[in-house]
Amino acid sequence: MAAMNTTNHHQGWRMPVPAHSGIYKLHLQAKESLGTAEVRDSVRLPRGIDRNEWIASNMVTLFEELVYMVSAITDVCSESTCPKMCAGKHTSYSWADEKQPAPRATSAPDYMRTLVMYTEDFLSDQTLVPGDGSPFPPAFLPMVKKLCKRFFRVYAHAYIHHFDNFQHFGAEAHLNCNFKHFLYFVLEFDLVGKQDMSPLAELIKMFLETDDRNRTKGKAKSEK
């Protein structure tokens, strides 16, 4: 089995928002809270924070996590092993954007590389993601929804076609943690439709039910 690239996963990647911006500071706050609070609670909009700014800051965090995952499977997800971007036998994905509006078939690695660059361009575009406190444009949220739908496709491909690779190298816990963060975020802000997430419906159901049971147990213990 080919090795997974679990080191240097930020090589060639740049932080798309300025380090001095409010969005970047919120990104650090959101990232820190992931280690100190339940994931479902950590994505909720804090009191007094602009909704779009909070969404933008979390998108930076989700993007970091996506880059890690894409980099981790670079050596096992290739043009030869994954010539088609898909999530199982019956779900395949094409790529389209403003420059090439006609959907085109693509390999999984090409889709993921294109998505990383596309997201990087979006997050660094000050007209779409203002870092100076200016109002967010109407195009911001539709673009976030488009990106989140595509982020999900990468997770679906990773789980369905490469989960054994993550297990083999002991990285499945990291994958699960990142996906749960993504899942609770898109559910909290209604960013990805249920039908779009159907390839991982059973996994999502398991995560939600397990989390509900754990929260119920925790609440019962605290009341004793």
Residue ranges and their predicted role:
Residues D132-L141, D164-N176, S198-L203:
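Short amphipathic alpha-helical segments embedded in low-complexity Lys/Glu-rich regions
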Residues A171-K224:
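Eukaryote-biased recognition of C-terminal alpha-helical segments
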Residues R150, N165, N178-F182:
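Extracellular/luminal segments of secreted precursors and ectodomains of membrane proteins
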Residues M1-P101:
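The feature captures two recurrent sequence modes
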Residues S124-T127, A156-D164, Y184-K194:
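Charged/polar positions within long, soluble alpha-helices
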Residues D50, T106-S107, G193:
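Helix N-terminus capping/helix-initiation residues
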Residues V67-M143, C148-F152, A156-Y159:
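Amphipathic alpha-helical interface segments within eukaryotic helical scaffold
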